[in-house]
């Protein structure tokens, strides 16, 4: 079978700061996810040619900002997709964190805007807002955050956020700011995305459903004079033959019991995330009909929240499925697989030769001479511009 020639795309990998292993739903084959292991995955992704890595966020994960700042110096080209959390962070503090990390790692920061879809976890973090209120906060947050990163002074009195004389002294390296990635399948989420972000993300639904969502988001954005790009979040299980790939998929959930599935689905059911609801509906908690679309397998979502589907097959088959998503407008693929170190190699070695990358043409312009030049004055002003010494 000859693989179709695919259009250009960016491929990102994943740093599993919430755990890793050979199997789901068990500690058998589990792996110690320490700094050395995360660094190893990042360095492998860098050397293999991935565009970047996603760092997850939430109470089940290590802090993504701390991990990114620790791992990034060990890589050269790899970008880091790190989450800001409207409602948990002040937009001014988040802007300073963003600018600082972007400067420290040389313009390799990507920003993932995460509103949060689990009311129980949100309350544990001190957020007692309804679904739509969270998106109201996200909109206000992003307006302030983007203005600060673009060098503007911000004075705003919103429903949820009030800022007086907000300023960012030290700008990010990327101009006007690092790219903003965002996923939200509800009407409120799409409304915010159309006005504020650069790349809209979806979880790995079948191509027809992804096409419907992409067309809807694109139409809303175009009505408002904006143009978005689109990405998808998927797992991958690629082997040299289709038979070996499907055997690996079955093996991944060999220890998952019905009780484990029921417990996981109970947690997912409490969430008010429309995206999570759509993921759960793909399999309905049943393990007998997991191939929901050709080579798209929903087994991961039986016990894992968020991204719950995987592309399964040999390299040519997986490349063909990737092209189906590209044909409906997807240009960025955020991927993962178990264990994450080994699967990063498999995908890169087996599939990268069959797909094109647009890395070189997808770099945000960088600022030159961003300073600072000398210590700030009274913690308020940048030093005066350098003046020529009079003779």
From Swiss-Prot:
Top-level division of the source organism's lineage: Bacteria
UniProt GO MF annotations: alkanesulfonate monooxygenase activity
Reactions catalysed: an alkanesulfonate + FMNH2 + O2 = an aldehyde + FMN + sulfite + H2O + 2 H(+)
Intrachain S-S bonds: none
Classification via Gene3D superfamilies: Luciferase-like domain
InterPro entries in the record: Alkanesulphonate_mOase_FMN-dep (IPR019911), Luciferase-like_dom (IPR011251), Luciferase-like_sf (IPR036661), SsuD_RutA_monooxygenase (IPR050172)
Homology family: Belongs to the SsuD family.
Function: Catalyzes the desulfonation of aliphatic sulfonates.
Name listed for the protein in its UniProt record: Alkanesulfonate monooxygenase
Gene this protein is translated from: ssuD
């Amino acid at each position: 079978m000859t693989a179709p020639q695919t259009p250009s795309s960016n491929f990102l990998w994943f740093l599993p700061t919430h755990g890793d292993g050979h199997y789901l739903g068990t500690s058998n084959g589990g792996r110690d996810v320490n700094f050395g292991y995360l660094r190893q995955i990042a360095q492998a992704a860098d050397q293999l040619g991935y565009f970047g890595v996603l760092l997850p966020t939430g109470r089940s994960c290590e802090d993504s900002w701390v991990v990114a700042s620790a791992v990034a110096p060990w890589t050269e080209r790899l970008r880091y997709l790190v989450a800001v959390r409207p409602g948990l962070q002040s937009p001014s503090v988040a802007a300073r964190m963003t600018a600082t990390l972007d400067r420290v790692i040389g313009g390799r920061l990507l920003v993932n805007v995460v509103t949060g879809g689990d009311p129980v976890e949100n309350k544990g973090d001190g957020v007692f807002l309804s679904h739509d209120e969270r998106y109201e906060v996200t909109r206000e947050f992003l307006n302030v955050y983007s203005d600060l990163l673009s060098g503007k002074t911000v004075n705003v009195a919103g429903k949820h956020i009030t800022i007086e004389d907000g300023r960012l002294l030290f700008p990010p390296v990327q101009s006007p700011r690092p790219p903003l990635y965002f996923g939200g399948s509800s009407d409120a989420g799409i409304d915010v995305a159309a006005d504020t972000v650069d790349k809209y993300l979806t979880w790995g639904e079948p191509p027809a459903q992804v096409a419907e969502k992409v067309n809807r988001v694109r139409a809303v954005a175009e009505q408002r004079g904006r143009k978005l790009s689109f990405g998808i979040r998927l797992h991958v299980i690629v082997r040299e033959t289709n038979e070996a790939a499907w055997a690996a998929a079955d093996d991944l959930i060999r220890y998952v019991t019905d009780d484990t599935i029921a417990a996981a689905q109970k947690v997912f059911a409490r969430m008010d995330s429309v995206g999570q609801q759509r993921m759960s509906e793909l399999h309905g908690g049943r393990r007998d009909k997991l191939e929901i679309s050709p080579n798209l397998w929903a087994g991961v979502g039986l016990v894992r929240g968020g991204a719950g589907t995987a592309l399964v097959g040999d390299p040519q088959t997986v490349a063909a499925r990737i092209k189906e998503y590209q044909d409906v407008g997807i240009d960025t693929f955020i991927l993962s697989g178990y264990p994450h170190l080994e699967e990063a190699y498999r995908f890169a070695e087996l599939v990268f030769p069959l797909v094109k990358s647009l890395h070189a043409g997808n770099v945000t312009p960088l600022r030159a001479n961003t300073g600072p030049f000398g210590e700030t004055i009274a913690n308020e002003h940048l030093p005066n511009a350098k003046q020529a010494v009079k003779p």
